[in-house]
């Protein structure tokens, strides 16, 4: 009997998603991509109905419907997310349930940019999706090419408005439905779209290549050896002998050296992103490190008390608040592994925030936290999650 082929993970991995206004064809395009690539043996064809009936997931206390499909091109392996409802998109992007390295913005040529088109572009910008490729869908339903040119111009202007390179972004025209139905010309368009995605959306930096960061979950003493801080490595790597800083909750940064590493009670040479490790810290007292701080590569992260965040506020049905809140609302902000109280200041012209809204507001924390642009947090009241957000700007 012939030996089974061994699966080699040789292709770089990229996370992408479809964004855009309702009924512009996001899910149809997702289905078409899987079908066309399946014909080349690079994917499993996913049915529109299967993608649309996305399973519920819970991410940081919030229920979100998301469909995950995967496929390959000749060059890469992709995980692609598609969310059925508009609210699911917002929640997905803000909570980071699906971290996207790039997105395909779907705009129907029959409609042009619509309110959710704008909202998804804004959110993509806020949460750090730096690369967008445009698919102008349903072009077969528009008789006049000049009208399609006009829609393309509008989309480019809208992207430029949110600091995307609107003039340079690739725009592909086609019909996702025709491709799904087997039209040869449109199948070629889908293959061309994926070539563009391959080339235009860069391969992200691997988590291991980023500066070391580990939120501290627990601290304990090993008699005769010293203090151990344990947690899950968020990014980067750490090895015995590395200098690290203990950052957060105090203005002062504590410098120390890792003198031992353990995982599953065994000693470890190198801890990588995703590993749960205990790090023995030289010359540190048990009282000097607490849950909620982070261990980090020296100089890579600072503490801040004031920031702007893009936040989704849970609706009453999702277990959130039943009433709106106003400026000076003081909930807890759960960063990394701990709650810190903060005072909210709403932007000019926003009187109050209703359950189910998404909003950008400024927060002043009562203790400094180790945060940076892109740090995720939840908003909690008495231990209950009432919102989730992303730091979009540091203000102090």
Swiss-Prot record:
One of its GO terms (molecular function) is GTP binding. Keywords: Cytoplasm, Elongation factor, GTP-binding, Hydrolase, Magnesium, Metal-binding, Nucleotide-binding, Protein biosynthesis. GTP hydrolase that promotes the GTP-dependent binding of aminoacyl-tRNA to the A-site of ribosomes during protein biosynthesis. Residues 137-140 are annotated as: G4. The lineage of its organism: Bacteria, Bacillati, Bacillota, Bacilli, Lactobacillales. Disulfide bonds: none annotated. This is Elongation factor Tu. GTP binds at residues 20-27, 82-86, 137-140. The gene is tuf. Its EC number is 3.6.5.3. Residues 82-85 are annotated as: G3.
């Amino acid at each position: 009997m012939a030996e089974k082929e061994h699966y080699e993970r040789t292709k770089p991995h990229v996370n992408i998603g479809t964004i855009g206004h309702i009924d512009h064809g996001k899910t149809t395009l997702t289905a078409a991509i899987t079908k066309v690539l399946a014909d080349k043996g690079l994917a499993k064809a996913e049915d529109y109905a299967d993608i649309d009936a996305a399973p519920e997931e819970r991410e940081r206390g919030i229920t979100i419907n998301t469909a995950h499909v995967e496929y390959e091109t000749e060059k890469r392996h992709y995980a692609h997310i598609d969310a059925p409802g508009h609210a699911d998109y917002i929640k997905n992007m803000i909570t980071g349930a699906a971290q996207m390295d790039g997105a395909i913005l779907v705009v129907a040529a029959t409609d042009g940019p619509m309110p959710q088109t704008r909202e998804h572009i804004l959110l993509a910008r806020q949460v750090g999706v730096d690369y967008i490729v445009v698919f102008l869908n349903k072009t077969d339903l528009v008789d006049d090419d000049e009208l399609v040119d006009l829609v393309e111009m509008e989309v480019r202007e809208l992207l430029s408005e949110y600091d995307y390179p609107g003039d340079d972004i690739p725009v592909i025209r086609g019909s996702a439905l025709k491709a799904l139905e087997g039209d040869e010309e449109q199948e070629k368009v889908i293959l061309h779209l994926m070539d563009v995605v391959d080339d235009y959306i860069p391969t992200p930096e691997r988590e291991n290549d980023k500066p070391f960061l580990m939120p501290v979950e627990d601290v304990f003493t090993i008699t005769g050896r010293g203090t151990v801080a344990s947690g899950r490595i968020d990014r980067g790597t750490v090895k015995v002998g590395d200098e690290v800083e203990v950052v957060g909750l105090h203005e002062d940064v504590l410098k120390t050296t890792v003198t031992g590493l353990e995982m599953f009670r065994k000693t470890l040479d190198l801890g990588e992103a995703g590993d749960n490790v205990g790090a023995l810290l030289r010359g540190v007292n048990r009282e000097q490190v607490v849950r909620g701080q982070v261990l980090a590569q020296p100089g890579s992260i600072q503490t801040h008390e004031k920031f702007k965040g893009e936040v989704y506020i849970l609706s009453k049905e999702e277990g959130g608040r039943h009433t709106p809140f106003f400026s000076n609302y003081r909930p807890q902000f759960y960063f990394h592994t701990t709650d810190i109280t903060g005072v909210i200041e709403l932007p000019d012209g926003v009187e109050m925030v209703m359950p189910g809204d998404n909003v950008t507001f400024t927060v002043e924390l009562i203790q400094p936290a180790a945060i940076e642009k892109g740090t995720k947090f939840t908003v909690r009241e008495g231990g209950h999650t009432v919102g989730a957000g992303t730091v979009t700007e540091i203000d102090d």
